[in-house]
Structure formats: structure tokens, C-alpha cells
Amino acid sequence: MKIGIIGAMEEEVTLLRDKIEKRQTISLGGCEIYTGQLNGTEVALLKSGIGKVAAALGATLLLEHCKPDVIINTGSAGGLAPTLKVGDIVVSDEARYHDADVTAFGYEYGQLPGCPAGFKADDKLIAAAEACIAELNLNAVRGLIVSGDAFINGSVGLAKIRHNFPQAIAVEMEATAIAHVCHNFNVPFVVVRAISDVADQQSHLSFDEFLAVAAKQSSLMVESLVQKLAHG
């Protein structure tokens, strides 16, 4: 099995990249892909850049050039579920855009024409992630993750997301674009991220302070998940 892993920022991939053995680097379209073995399992780790376009471009390049069997999206996220704290884990069962609006033509809010309203994560990947969470004794929430090209740190943006997606557990800037590409390629995906901030008016300060904590927790989870998928 070859496992594709996608993170947006340097801080979100560096811990995993440093553990890849026999590492080779591929630079394509502004993205970097690191291939090799993580604890004996073949992986391709993508640093995509921030935002939906960068994530979709990178995911497409990763799928075309490296042909992974599954995709794990890692990194940080802003917490929406009330129980979440910095360092806690969120696992997607679905991903949706929070900044797409074609409702004038009868689509659901967040749905694009020709696409489902939401992109469902793979049940087996979710189960494997939840098994890892239990083994690592981490706090985690599973549910809807929403994405858009905005860092949410104000009451207006937060209120809009809560109104349109009251069930959402976390918000970030890439996951749904990656899920969209995986849907088109028919490749299973799951989003496994760690909370860096709570999406409020101070979230930009929290993000800067706690990004390293989130990166460490999400990398720990991904490393465990890779082992679980490869060896059961």
C-alpha cells in the first residue's frame, strides 16, 4: 500500500518529512512532494501551500504522479465543536465548502454544480483513525469539517458558518478541496487534523502560539494511522 499525506504548511509537514527514509523530493507547480518510506511503509507526502486552489492542484499532482491508494489530509484546524481544545484531534466523516453559494439555482449552501453537497470520508479510514485515537488516548471529535479561503477570526464569519453548518466540528482552508479531488479520482480519503485555535476573535493569536502543538499532535496521529493501515 502507498499512502498519500497532504499538509498545507511547512510546519504541518516537517515532523513527518524528517522521518521519511530514502527520501526524494519532487517539485511541481509550486508544490513539493516527498517520497520514501515511513516506518517501512511507502508514502508520498505533499506540501501543497495554503488555500483551496493550492490544495486541489497539489492533490491532483500527487494522485497523478505518485498513485497513492489512499489520502490523509493532516495539519491544523480551528475548533467549532464546544468540547474541543488546542491539541485535540478532529476526524472527518464529511467535508463541505463554507464559502460556496449557488443556492439561487436550487443547490444546497456549500454545494457546487455537478458535485455532491458534501464529500464523504472513507469508512475504513475513519475506523482506523478512531482506533489510533483510542490507542494513543487522545481527545477527538468526528464530524463535518468545512473549508473556505478565509481564516476565521471574527464574530461575523464565525456566525455565518455556525448558521449554515451548525453541525460542523472544525474549519480550515484545504480539506474540502482535497476531498473534492479524491472524489473525482475515486480515491478514499480522510481528514485528520489537530486543533490550533478556536475560531473566535483571538484565533489569529492562538494559531501563532499553538501551531507547533497542533503540528506535533497531527503528525503523531498520521504516523500511527500509516502504521495501522499498513499492518492492521
From Swiss-Prot:
Classification via HAMAP family: Salvage_MtnN (MF_01684)
Name by which UniProt lists this protein: 5'-methylthioadenosine/S-adenosylhomocysteine nucleosidase
Job of this protein: Catalyzes the irreversible cleavage of the glycosidic bond in both 5'-methylthioadenosine (MTA) and S-adenosylhomocysteine (SAH/AdoHcy) to adenine and the corresponding thioribose, 5'-methylthioribose and S-ribosylhomocysteine, respectively. Also cleaves 5'-deoxyadenosine, a toxic by-product of radical S-adenosylmethionine (SAM) enzymes, into 5-deoxyribose and adenine. Thus, is required for in vivo function of the radical SAM enzymes biotin synthase and lipoic acid synthase, that are inhibited by 5'-deoxyadenosine accumulation.
A biological process term (GO) from this entry: purine deoxyribonucleoside catabolic process
Enzyme class: hydrolase
Residue ranges of coiled coil: none
EC nos: 3.2.2.9
Binding site for substrate: 78, 152, 173-174
Catalytic machinery residues: 12, 197
GO cellular component annotations of the record: cytosol
Naturally occurring in which organism (per UniProt): Escherichia coli O9:H4 (strain HS)
Family classification: Belongs to the PNP/UDP phosphorylase family. MtnN subfamily.
Record keyword Zinc present: no
Pathway participation: Amino-acid biosynthesis; L-methionine biosynthesis via salvage pathway; S-methyl-5-thio-alpha-D-ribose 1-phosphate from S-methyl-5'-thioadenosine (hydrolase route): step 1/2
Catalytic activity from the UniProt record: S-adenosyl-L-homocysteine + H2O = S-(5-deoxy-D-ribos-5-yl)-L-homocysteine + adenine; S-methyl-5'-thioadenosine + H2O = 5-(methylsulfanyl)-D-ribose + adenine; 5'-deoxyadenosine + H2O = 5-deoxy-D-ribose + adenine
A Gene Ontology molecular function term of the record: methylthioadenosine nucleosidase activity
Keywords, in A-Z order: Amino-acid biosynthesis, Hydrolase, Methionine biosynthesis
Transmembrane parts of this sequence: none
Matching Pfam families: PNP_UDP_1
Summary of subunit composition and partner proteins: Homodimer.
Listed SUPFAM superfamilies: Purine and uridine phosphorylases
